[in-house]
Every structure is written in C-alpha cells, then in structure tokens.
Amino acid sequence: SLTGIYNRYGFDELAEQMITKNPEAKFVAVLLDIDDFKFVNDIYGHVYGDNALKSLADSMKAFFPSGALLGRNGGDEFVILLKDYSYDDVKEKLQQFTMAPKTFSYKGKEHQFSISLGYAEYPTFASNRSQLMRCADAALYEIKLHGKNGCMAYKEGLELRARKQLGFAFKDISENLPGAFIIYRADKEDDELFYANQEFLHMTGYKDMDELF
C-alpha cells in the first residue's frame, strides 16, 4: 500500500477484535488528518501529496509503540488504537506528536505541513469500537473548528455540538431541494441522524429535530 499501514477495513476488523477480546482493557482511539491537504495537492500535485501521506505514516510508525494499531481511513485521515492507555497516559505524547515538525519533499526541498488530531477513551465514553471512533471524530471536528494544528480529547457534549454544526450546514445546502428527506449515517451498530428538513418533519408529525433523537 501507499503508506505501509492498514487500510480502513483491515484496521476496523482488527480494532473490533482487540476491543471484543479485551472488554476490561482501556483503549484510546486517535483520528488525525493533514491540515489543508487539498491545497498541498493543488499547489504541489498529487505525487507530492502522496509524499506527505507517506511521511506522516512513517512518523506514526516511528513515534508510537510497536503494539499500536495504525491505519489510514482514506484520503488524508489516519487512525490509531492504543491498548492499555488512558487520557492521562497519552495527553502529553499526543500533544508532542501533533506539534512535532512534519515535512515532505518537493523538488529537492523540504516543505512543512501540520496536522489536527482528536482522541477518545474506551470504555469511559463508548461501549464499542464504532462509538469510540465517533467520539474521536467529534474531537477532531472540534479542533478543526478552532483553527486546526492542534489536538483535543473528547468530552461529553462534543458529539452533539458537531452534529448541530453539521445540521446547520445541511440546512443551508438543502434549502432549495424539493421533497421530504433526512440525512443520516448508516452504521450496523449505531445509526446516527444529522438532519431532517421541514417537509419530512411535517409529513411525519414531528415538531422539530429534537423529537427525532
């Protein structure tokens, strides 16, 4: 593979096994991506975008312990699962990794890039892998809203806040679309609703979105 680490499907399968086989263990899931990766591709080209992805994957392999499960979800998003770690164990390390200089090569020169990172703890905030990743994703989304190039631990309420932000975005996008519809994430373990337009609420007899949750 391009990065030499697990793809999304391989990572998800192994992460599921690790958590299922060790229900009493603590885990920390980490989601991270390259800030403004689209601009890296647009300015330097996809070959050099790939160099940035490889560079980040190599940094992850060198920095995190050998027992860490490393994967790439696709695009510029990467994921890590750390077994027998808690927030207190990882806070300083993840901050250090986020702030460490990261570069890729372009025409013989090194160019810097930054990352954003969100993480969540199992079983404190989640009862399964899917929920754990969703919490880490909410923390990553929050750091993106606050200027990128940083890391954040998940805390109660972040997921709802992220969902509301997405709801506002979907409302703007769908304002002129005809018909009744909802937007949700289909998940075999835990479906998640993002948005329902007024036509759908009227058709189903609900007053507002809150009644659907």
Model segments located where?
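Flexible, glycine/charge-rich interdomain/linker segments that couple
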Residues: P123, E142-Q165
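Catalytic-core segments of nucleotide cyclases and related cyclic-nucleotide turnover enzymes
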Residues: H46, K91, Y122-K148
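Conserved nucleotide-binding and Mg2+-coordinating catalytic segments in signaling enzymes
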Residues: S1-E13, L32-H46, K54
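Short regulatory alpha-helical coupling segments
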Residues: R8-K26, A57-P65, Q165-F168
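A short pre-motif secondary-structure segment
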Residues: A68-R72
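Active-site-proximal alpha-helical element of nucleotidyl cyclase-like catalytic domains
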Residues: Q17, Y48-G67, E77, L81, ...
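PAS/PAS-like sensory domain cap-loop motif
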Residues: F200-L212
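Catalytic strand-loop-helix junctions within cyclic-nucleotide turnover domains
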Residues: L81-V90, K107-E110, I115-L132, L158, ...
